[in-house]
C-alpha cells in the first residue's frame, strides 16, 4: 500500500477508492489510510463528508445536487440523472486507482451495479476489486458470489460472502460485545429482568412485540444531516461619496 523510495527507484503508494461510507466503508478507509495508501471515497449522502475526511480520505463529490438520504442513515434509490453522473465519476476513477472497495447497499433491494465491465476492463493489470455487497448480488458486474474472478486484463474481483467467518476470533469478539451492550441497555437494574424503554433508540429498534402489541417496524431513526448553508448577509450598499469641490 505505502510508497517506497529505494536506490532502485521510487514506488508510488497505492490508490484506493471506497464506494459507500457506512460502517464497512469507513473501516476500509481507515485501514487503507493507515497502510499509507492514497484513499478517496464516494457516498450519495453528503452528510458523511466530514466522516470520510476525518478518516484521512478525499471525499469525491458530484457537480449534481439531489437529496440522497432517506432519513434513517441509509441511501435511497437515486434518479437516472444522478446515477449517470456518478457512473461517469467511477469510470474516470477506475482508470487511476489500484484498488476499489464497494459497500453500497439499499435496504430491501438488490445491490446496485456501480462498477461495469467496461470500467473493470479499463483498470491496470493487477488491480483488485473487493465487493462487500456480493451477498446481495454485488456492486460489480464481474462479481461472482463466493468466488475470486480474474478478468482477461488481470483484474481480480473478490466476491466472498463469508468474510466474518474468515475472521472468526475478531467476529466473535465484536458480536459478543454487541450482545453485552444490548443486554445492558435492556437490564439497567442488573436484576436479570428485561425492560423495554422506548425512550432509548437502541431498545426501540430491537423490540418487535411489547405487552402483546406488535411494535415492528420501528419509526425511522433520524440521523444528522449535512447542515444547510447559512444565508449570507448582504451588506447594505453605501452611496458613493459626493464629488470633491475643485477650486477651478
Question: Where do the protein language model's features map onto the residues?
Answer:
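Charged, alpha-helix-enriched surfaces in structured cytosolic catalytic cores
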Residues: 47, 85, 92, 124, ...
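Glycine-rich phosphate/diphosphate-binding loop of Rossmann-like nucleotide-binding domains
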Residues: 1-93
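Short, solvent-exposed amphipathic alpha-helical segments in soluble enzyme
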Residues: 33-35, 55-57, 116-122, 144-148, ...
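Adenosine-phosphate binding glycine-rich loop
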Residues: 4, 13, 134, 140-222
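Short acidic/glycine-rich loop or secondary-structure boundary segments that cap or lie
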Residues: 49-50, 69-70, 109-111, 137-141, ...
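ADP-ribose/adenylate-binding Rossmann-like module
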Residues: 99-158
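Cytosolic-side membrane-insertion boundary helix
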Residues: 228-248
Amino acid at each position: 500500500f505505502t510508497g517506497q523510495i529505494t536506490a532502485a527507484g521510487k514506488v508510488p503508494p497505492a490508490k484506493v477508492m471506497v464506494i459507500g461510507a457506512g460502517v464497512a466503508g469507513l473501516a476500509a478507509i481507515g485501514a487503507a489510510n493507515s497502510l499509507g495508501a492514497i484513499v478517496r471515497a464516494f457516498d450519495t449522502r453528503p452528510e458523511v463528508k466530514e466522516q470520510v475526511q476525518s478518516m484521512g480520505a478525499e471525499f469525491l463529490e458530484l457537480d449534481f445536487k439531489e437529496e440522497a438520504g432517506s432519513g434513517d442513515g441509509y441511501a435511497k434509490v437515486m434518479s437516472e440523472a444522478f446515477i449517470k453522473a456518478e457512473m461517469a465519476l467511477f469510470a474516470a476513477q477506475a482508470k487511476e486507482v489500484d484498488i476499489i472497495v464497494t459497500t453500497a447497499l439499499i435496504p430491501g433491494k438488490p445491490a446496485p451495479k456501480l462498477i461495469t465491465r467496461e470500467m473493470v476492463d479499463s483498470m491496470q493489470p493487477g488491480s483488485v476489486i473487493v465487493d462487500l455487497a456480493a451477498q446481495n448480488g454485488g456492486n460489480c458486474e464481474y462479481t461472482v458470489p463466493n468466488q475470486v474472478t480474474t478478468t482477461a486484463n488481470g483484474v481480480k474481483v473478490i466476491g466472498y460472502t463469508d468474510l466474518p467467518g474468515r475472521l472468526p476470533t475478531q467476529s466473535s469478539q465484536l458480536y459478543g460485545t454487541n450482545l453485552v451492550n444490548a443486554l445492558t441497555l435492556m437490564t439497567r437494574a442488573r436484576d436479570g429482568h428485561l425492560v423495554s424503554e422506548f425512550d432509548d433508540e437502541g431498545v426501540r429498534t430491537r423490540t418487535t412485540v411489547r405487552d402483546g402489541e406488535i411494535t415492528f417496524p420501528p419509526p425511522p431513526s433520524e440521523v444528522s444531516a449535512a447542515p444547510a448553508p447559512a444565508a449570507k448577509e448582504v451588506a447594505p450598499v453605501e452611496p458613493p461619496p459626493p464629488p470633491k469641490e475643485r477650486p477651478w
